[in-house]
Amino acid sequence: MNANRKSLEDKVAVITGGARRIGACIARTLHHEGMKLVIHYHKSAEAARELQAELHHHRPDSVLLVGTDLLDPAKLEKLVSQATAEFGQLDVLVNNASSFYPTPVGQTTDEQWDDLIGVNLKAPYFLSQAAAGPLTVSGGCIINLVDIYAERPLKNHPVYNVTKAGLIGLTRALARELGPEVRVNAVAPGAILWPDGDVDEIAQQRLISRTPLKRTGNPTDIAQTVLFLVRDAEFLTGQIVNVDGGRSIVP
């Protein structure tokens, strides 16, 4: 270990949507560095309990699970207060939870709009607002998970695209609002994990063919980038880090 590298031992992170997929990989990575975790989940209770048991096997009493609906503003403040009540501080907020599904123009409902905006943009804002106080005390940071589709819109997903573009704007705005005590950055994944459900293999291969590295990434690529932003990037704020195999540079 680099002697000059900041230790994350006993630091505390809240990770939304941390029970599965990329969120779980981020949780494992930060926990491996000695952090205590508050893992939020909504409908993935079984996966959350399995992950907690796995992490507690390595370090007992280091993970708190909080199941809640991010569409309920009152519960967002409670999520932060539960973290500080359990572990006494908050050092990192990872806004990872996200809803993703098509909303073709002409077929989008009010409910879909409210759900996507609520989970992908409103919740990160109000969680960040609730966390700003303890993060200011600890000199901590916020990491938002955005998407390369924020700037390269995905067809038939206009509302999702808008939410991620908004989250990029929020990342930069919060960096100005909360600095110098709190750093705020974002990670924009490319093709890492395909969405749950039906998979269009032709579309997958088309995307990979337009990626300079000619392959997909994996959740560890995202988790290691989050770790870098948390631990090593002390002079970085308001930045969006694309982890996409170069897809964002290809027309």
Q: How would you describe each model-predicted region?
A:
Residues 2-5, 152, 227, 231-251:
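Short C-terminal tail/terminal secondary-structure segment
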